[in-house]
């Protein structure tokens, strides 16, 4: 057991912090051999783990459309924000630009920014899409009920949870519909290139995407609820496969 821990420590020295953090959180009740197997699995697949909220992948399987029918564009009056919040908005916009999440826009559409205080008292950047959502044709794709997901776990003894980092930002919006996501700041006007939080049909599109990607595995070896995935197995060997 001591030898395994020492070897693991040496092998982990060259790994980035976000990967060693995963290793540190492996459950304590794994056997030494199971732990070695889990560590090796994480190391082999380390490029799949995101370093931050802005270290994103991008799928080409779907593109989100925003069907507003014949409704004309609207432009909301610029909302005033407390002076202390303006640097937060500026920083978030700069980070989204750098991550290719948004781009500058000249659009007849414009929704307002809102900052929502999270439990840790930090501020979440959001766009108020309620007016746009009221004009949008709704997607009826079903989202699984959490209680149905839990019942499907059955006799599973091994569970792994995966949370897609900024999952919505990994699916693109159709170029012709991006103007509809426009928002305005003191620095200028921007639009989303990828799925934005708060859009009416974002959950339906993302659930459909995940069900497509994991077709043949859902309800058999994994459960998917939007950007949360549970992998479940009765044995450890099945689990690492």
Describe the predicted segments one by one.
Residues 1, 5-12:
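Intrinsically disordered, low-complexity serine/threonine-rich segments
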Residues 10-14, 47-74, 116-124, 141, ...:
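Reverse-transcriptase-like RNA-dependent polymerase core
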Residues 13-141, 220-237:
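Reverse-transcribing Pol proteins
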Residues 161, 234-241:
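Polymerase palm active-site segment centered on the conserved acidic dipeptide of motif C
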């Amino acid at each position: 057991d001591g030898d395994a821990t020492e070897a693991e420590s040496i092998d982990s020295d060259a790994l980035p912090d976000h990967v060693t953090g995963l290793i540190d959180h492996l459950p304590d009740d794994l056997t030494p051999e199971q732990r070695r197997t889990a560590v090796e699995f994480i190391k082999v697949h380390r490029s799949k783990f995101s370093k931050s909220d802005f270290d994103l992948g991008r799928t080409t399987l779907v593109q989100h459309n925003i069907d507003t029918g014949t409704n004309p564009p609207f432009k909301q009056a610029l909302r005033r924000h407390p002076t202390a919040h303006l640097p937060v908005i500026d920083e978030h916009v700069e980070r989204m630009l750098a991550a290719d999440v948004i781009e500058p826009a000249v659009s007849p559409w414009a929704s307002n920014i809102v900052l929502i205080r999270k439990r840790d008292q930090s501020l979440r950047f959001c766009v108020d899409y309620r007016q746009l959502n009221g004009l949008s044709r709704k997607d009826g794709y079903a989202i699984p009920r959490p209680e149905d997901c839990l019942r499907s776990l059955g006799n599973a003894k091994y569970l792994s949870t995966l949370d897609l980092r900024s999952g919505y930002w990994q699916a693109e919006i159709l170029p012709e519909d991006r103007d509809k996501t426009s928002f305005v700041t003191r620095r200028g006007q921007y639009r989303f290139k990828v799925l934005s939080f708060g859009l009416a049909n974002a959950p339906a599109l993302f659930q459909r995407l995940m069900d497509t990607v994991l077709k043949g595995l859902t309800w058999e070896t994994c459960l998917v609820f939007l950007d949360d995935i549970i992998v479940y197995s009765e044995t450890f060997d099945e689990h690492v496969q």
